[in-house]
C-alpha cells in the first residue's frame, strides 16, 4: 500500500511540474496571447540569420571568398608543354594524359594551360596585326589619286582620212623641163597648209596641177 501511495504522489508532483512549465494561453480583453518562445536564440533560428549566411572575416569585415589555387610550373614542365603546343594546339584526351604522366600534372591542369596558351597567342597575333594595318593604310594612301572623279582614259585616235589623187593628174601630158623651171610661183593656197598644219587625223592633199601647160613662144602679132 505504501508503494502505491508513493507512486501516486510522484505522478501528481510530475503533473504539477508539467503544468507549471507549460502554461495555458490566457485571453485578456479579447486578444489571444501566444506562448511562443521569444528568446534571442529561438528568434535567430526562426529568422534564418544562422542559415546560409557567410561568415565575416574578423579582420576586414568581409565574407570569406573561395580562393583559386594557382598552379606554378617549373622550367622542365613549361618546356614540355611548349613543345607539345608547337606540335598541336588542340591535343585530345590521350595526348593530355600522356603529358600528365610526363610532367606530373593533372589532365585538367594541362587542359587549362592549353586554353590559356591559345588565348595568349591570339592576343599576340592581334597586337602584331594592328600596327601593320595602320602602316599599310598610311603608306599606300599617298600613291592613290586624290579624287577618282576623273579617271585616266587612253582613247585611240581616229584613223587618218585617205588622200585621193586628183582626177586630172594622169590625163595631162608630161611637161617639158623648161616649162617646169618657168612655172608660176606657188599660190597662197599651196603653202598655206605648211604654215598651218591640218587638224589631227587628216593629212593635207597636194594641190592639183595647172590645167593648161605654159609655153615659151610669144604670140605673134596679126599684121
UniProtKB/Swiss-Prot annotation:
Comp. bias regions, Basic and acidic residues: 1-13
Record bears the keyword Cell membrane: no
Outcome, altering residue 85 to S: Shows no significant DNA binding to a Prop1 response element in gel shift assays; transcriptional activation of a luciferase reporter gene is reduced to approximately 34% compared with that of wild-type Prop1 in transiently transfected human embryonic kidney cells
General function of this protein: Possibly involved in the ontogenesis of pituitary gonadotropes, as well as somatotropes, lactotropes and caudomedial thyrotropes.
Protein name: Homeobox protein prophet of Pit-1
Transmembrane segments: none
InterPro entries named in the record: HD, Homeobox_CS, Homeodomain-like_sf, PROP1
A molecular-function term among this protein's GO annotations: DNA-binding transcription activator activity, RNA polymerase II-specific
Sequence segments annotated as region (Disordered): 1-69, 168-223
Known DNA-binding region: 66-125
Keywords, sorted A to Z: DNA-binding, Homeobox, Nucleus
Biased composition (Polar residues): 171-180
Pfam families: Homeodomain
One GO biological process term: animal organ morphogenesis
Any single Gene Ontology cellular-component annotation: nucleus
SMART domains: HOX
Similarity comment text for this entry: Belongs to the paired homeobox family.
Compartment annotation: Nucleus
Amino acid at each position: 500500500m505504501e508503494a502505491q501511495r508513493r507512486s501516486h504522489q510522484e505522478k501528481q508532483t510530475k503533473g504539477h511540474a508539467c503544468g507549471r512549465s507549460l502554461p495555458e494561453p490566457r485571453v485578456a480583453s479579447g486578444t489571444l496571447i501566444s506562448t511562443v518562445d521569444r528568446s534571442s536564440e529561438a528568434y535567430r533560428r526562426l529568422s534564418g540569420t544562422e542559415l546560409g549566411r557567410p561568415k565575416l572575416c574578423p579582420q576586414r569585415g568581409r565574407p570569406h571568398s573561395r580562393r583559386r589555387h594557382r598552379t606554378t610550373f617549373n622550367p622542365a614542365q613549361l618546356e614540355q608543354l611548349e613543345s607539345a603546343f608547337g606540335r598541336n594546339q588542340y591535343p585530345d584526351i590521350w595526348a593530355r594524359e600522356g603529358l600528365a604522366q610526363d610532367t606530373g600534372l593533372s589532365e585538367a591542369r594541362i587542359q587549362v594551360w592549353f586554353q590559356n596558351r591559345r588565348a595568349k597567342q591570339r592576343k599576340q597575333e592581334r597586337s602584331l596585326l594592328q600596327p601593320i594595318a595602320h602602316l599599310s593604310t598610311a603608306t599606300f594612301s599617298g600613291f592613290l589619286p586624290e579624287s577618282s572623279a576623273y579617271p585616266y582614259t587612253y582613247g585611240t585616235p581616229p584613223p587618218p582620212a585617205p588622200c585621193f589623187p586628183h582626177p586630172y593628174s594622169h590625163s595631162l601630158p608630161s611637161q617639158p623641163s623648161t616649162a617646169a623651171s618657168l612655172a608660176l610661183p606657188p599660190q597662197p593656197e599651196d603653202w598655206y597648209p605648211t604654215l598651218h598644219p591640218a587638224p589631227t587625223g587628216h593629212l593635207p592633199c597636194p594641190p592639183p596641177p595647172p590645167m593648161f601647160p605654159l609655153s615659151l613662144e610669144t604670140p605673134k602679132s596679126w599684121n
